[in-house]
Swiss-Prot record:
Matches recorded under InterPro entries: Aldolase_TIM (IPR013785), Elp3/MiaA/NifB-like_rSAM (IPR006638), Lipoyl_synth (IPR003698), rSAM (IPR007197)
Domain of life, per lineage: Bacteria
Pathway: Protein modification; protein lipoylation via endogenous pathway; protein N(6)-(lipoyl)lysine from octanoyl-[acyl-carrier-protein]: step 2/2
Listed EC numbers: 2.8.1.8
CDD domains associated with the record: Radical_SAM (cd01335)
Entry protein name: Lipoyl synthase
Any one cellular-component term (Gene Ontology): cytoplasm
Taxonomic lineage from the root: Bacteria, Pseudomonadati, Thermodesulfobacteriota, Desulfuromonadia, Geobacterales
Homology family: Belongs to the radical SAM superfamily. Lipoyl synthase family.
Domain Radical SAM core: 47-263
GO molecular function: 4 iron, 4 sulfur cluster binding; lipoate synthase activity; metal ion binding
Catalysis: reaction(s): [[Fe-S] cluster scaffold protein carrying a second [4Fe-4S](2+) cluster] + N(6)-octanoyl-L-lysyl-[protein] + 2 oxidized [2Fe-2S]-[ferredoxin] + 2 S-adenosyl-L-methionine + 4 H(+) = [[Fe-S] cluster scaffold protein] + N(6)-[(R)-dihydrolipoyl]-L-lysyl-[protein] + 4 Fe(3+) + 2 hydrogen sulfide + 2 5'-deoxyadenosine + 2 L-methionine + 2 reduced [2Fe-2S]-[ferredoxin]
Binding site for [4Fe-4S] cluster 1: 35, 40, 46, 274
Length: 281
């Protein structure tokens, strides 16, 4: 496959901010971020203004998604029982009004890490009760009891990314489109006061009508919030980019999604699921 050259609209200017302070805090508290692990293109912007998406439950994922830069391992390290406290301290010291917390998929754990998510929410609420806590969770292998554990912690937003259209789900090793959709539906049914959110990457070879069908599926299961962004391959070893989607198409899809009833939509080439996360709350 011919390697696509990045168009002009993806030549992002890197802002100069106080990144060193953020990196120092993360190092001091021994915390991971998906910003660093996934090579997020917005890391300079977010770190520069004191924002980060925290990665709990270790740095290793038990699945082999071909688009993702997070490390893989069949048996990652056991959860760090002190991690929730340290993350809460970071939230307090950064004075965050909105925090996003995610994790690798942990199929090796009986509850998929749900209890650790709940403990982290509780720790943040104890020291910073006014902070909105958004959780971006894996599919927990379809375990409804694990989902119930997370919902019982009462996060401000429960997010789970569909990532792409059903036809291309081979890039999500071990995942299932219907199972992911069911998680969002179950969350909306079990805890209607907690809004749900999902994200889709464009540029993997999907057709526009396939994306529209996914948006309709999300609204059918009660999903409130949506992010749409351009897939960028972390390296030549990862899933290649099939197409660079022009900004005008992101604008079109945002307008169509809002017309379907999504409460808030972030749509653009550099949008990621936690980018401008406070705009959803």
């Amino acid at each position: 496959m011919k390697i696509q050259r990045k168009p002009e609209w993806l030549r992002k200017k890197v802002p100069q901010g106080e990144q060193a302070a953020m990196r120092g805090l993360l190092s001091e508290l021994k915390l991971n971020t998906v910003c660093q692990q996934a090579l997020c293109p917005n890391i300079a912007e977010c770190f520069g203004c004191g924002q980060a998406t925290f990665l709990i439950l270790g740095r290793d994922c038990t699945r082999q998604c071909s688009f993702c830069n997070v490390d893989k391992a069949p048996r990652p390290q056991a959860p760090d029982a002190d991690e929730p406290r340290r993350l809460a301290e970071a939230v307090l010291r950064l004075k965050l009004s909105h925090v996003v917390i995610t994790s690798p998929t942990r199929d090796d754990l009986a509850d998929g890490g749900a209890g650790h998510y709940a403990a982290t929410v509780a720790a943040v609420r104890e020291v910073s009760p006014g902070t909105a806590v958004e959780l971006l969770v894996p599919d927990f292998g379809g375990d409804h009891a694990a989902l119930a554990t997370v919902l019982a912690a009462q996060p401000s937003i429960l997010a789970h990314n569909l990532e792409t259209v059903p036809r291309l789900y081979e890039v999500r090793k071990g995942a299932d489109y219907q199972r992911s959709l069911d998680l969002l539906q179950q969350a909306a049914l079990r805890a209607p006061a907690i809004p749900t959110k999902s994200g889709i990457m464009l540029g993997l070879g999907e057709e526009l009508d396939e994306v529209r069908a996914v948006l309709q599926d999300l609204r059918r299961v009660g999903c409130s919030y949506l992010s749409l962004g351009q897939y960028l391959a972390p390296s030549k070893r990862h899933q290649p980019v099939v197409a660079y989607i022009p900004p005008q198409q992101f604008d079109l899809l945002r307008d169509e999604a809002l017309a379907l009833g999504f409460r808030h939509v972030e749509s653009g080439p550099y949008v990621r699921s936690s980018y401008h996360a406070a705009n959803y709350a």
